[in-house]
């Protein structure tokens, strides 16, 4: 091999590394941009209900009695932490109504909301932070399966900008 082809190979690898870093930063940016402007989904409203310590049954029994309820009242009671309910109420509610769900995320989310406030972006930021663990995890998985750093970095790059992973981060 001549020195020119070796230099071209190094240059190619350097550009590839820069491209991977740029794509990774872009994927992280997508995860944290406009967290408060995305549509608040049904699952997110149920998550807010769960971390507030109320169950679906309690909400229906207390508030669906044939009278008009304002959105502000529902948000104040069921999408914010209040002193009536504790983290243990969150665990009990999950155990009775949705035992297939692990309480760890909901307890973490409850403490996160208590620490940083009940805004939509705050609740979503915890999930976005947790989603960053997918990068070392997918790299490690690829390393275990293929013993190849390049396969790992390609997988990280794909997951970084995957619409599915960005949307549900």
What kind of feature is each model-predicted range?
Residues 125-146:
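Transmembrane-helix motifs of polytopic, lipid-linked glycan transferases
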Residues 30, 109, 113, 117, ...:
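Membrane-water interface at transmembrane helix exits
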Residues 155-160:
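Short helix- or helix-capping micro-motifs
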Residues 29-46, 61-69:
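Helix-to-loop transition at the C-terminal end of transmembrane segments
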Residues 96, 100, 104, 108-126, ...:
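Juxtamembrane segments of multi-pass membrane glycosylation machinery
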Residues 164-169:
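Membrane-interface helix caps and helix-loop-helix hairpins in membrane proteins
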Residues 1-30, 144:
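Start-transfer (signal-anchor) and selected internal transmembrane alpha helices
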Residues 52-101, 105, 113:
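Interfacial juxtamembrane loops and adjacent helix segments
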């Amino acid at each position: 091999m001549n020195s020119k082809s070796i230099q071209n190979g190094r240059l190619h690898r350097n550009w590839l590394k820069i491209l991977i870093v740029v794509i990774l930063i872009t994927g992280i940016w997508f995860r944290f941009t406009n967290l408060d402007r995305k549509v608040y989904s049904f699952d997110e409203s149920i998550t807010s209900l769960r971390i507030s310590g109320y169950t679906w049954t309690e909400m229906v029994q207390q508030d669906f009695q044939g009278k008009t309820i304002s959105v502000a009242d529902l948000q104040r009671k069921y999408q914010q932490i209040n002193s009536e309910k504790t983290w243990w109420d969150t665990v009990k509610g999950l155990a009775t109504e949705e035992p297939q769900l692990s309480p760890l995320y909901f307890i973490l989310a409850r403490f996160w909301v208590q620490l940083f406030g009940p805004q939509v972006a705050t609740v979503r930021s915890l999930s976005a932070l947790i989603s960053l663990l997918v990068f070392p995890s997918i790299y490690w998985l690829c390393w275990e399966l293929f013993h190849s750093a390049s396969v790992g970095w390609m997988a990280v790059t794909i997951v970084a900008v995957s619409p599915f992973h960005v949307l549900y981060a």
